[in-house]
Amino acid sequence: YTTLFRSDPENFKNGDHTMTFMRTEKGKSILIEHNVMTPRPYNRKYQLTGSRGYANKYPVEEFCFAKEVIANEPEFKGVKINEHDAIPEGIQKVLMEKYMHPIWKELQDVAKKVGGHGGMDYIMDYRLVYCLRNGLPLDMDVYDLAEWCCVVELSRLSIENGCAPVEVPDFTRGAWDKIEGYSHAMAE
């Protein structure tokens, strides 16, 4: 793709590596990187970074926590941990088990066996079919779909305008903050 359009700037506005930076209404930051052109190791870049900790899932699974988190988590008692170092693998395994999501706990074996991307594709498909079969609301609704899909088009508009900020439309017409938290619908 790159070699086809690089000599035709009218049809190729992107670089090989595109970064989309978003700031939410609640002041959170999201960075999405897309690069399928340059040679480099495969990395899904599933990473969360915040003032109380850091989590990276693939290809290297590691976690770091702020001092107050380390002080309040019983698993850290008696273990000397620097907040700028990854926690020891043994403690990481204990925490992963302690905070494992119930859906993953139930489906992880079959998900890893038959599902792509470490099982996440299977989980998403499983939840869609489960909700449809049981007449439950889907985990992702039409507003999620619109928000996820608009990122590509809004990124294009930003690139065409010198990487200018672009407002994300409020597809919910003002109801974006009415849902309290997030939960999975389950059949009785």
Feature roles, as predicted:
Residues 1-4:
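Short, small-residue-biased leader/transition segments that mark boundaries at the very start
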Residues 6-8, 24-26, 36-38, 52, ...:
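Short, flexible loop/turn elements at secondary-structure junctions
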Residues 9-12, 38-41, 56:
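Short glycine/serine/proline-enriched coil/turn segments at secondary-structure junctions
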Residues 15, 20-26, 48-50:
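Active-site beta-strand termini and strand-to-loop segments that position acidic
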Residues 17, 32-42, 116-117:
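Glycine-rich phosphate/pyrophosphate-binding beta-alpha loops
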Residues 35, 60-61:
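Residue-level structural signal for beta-strand termini and adjacent loop
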Residues 41-44, 49-51, 56-59, 70-188:
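C-terminal helical cap and adjacent loop that interface with cofactors, partners, or active-site loops
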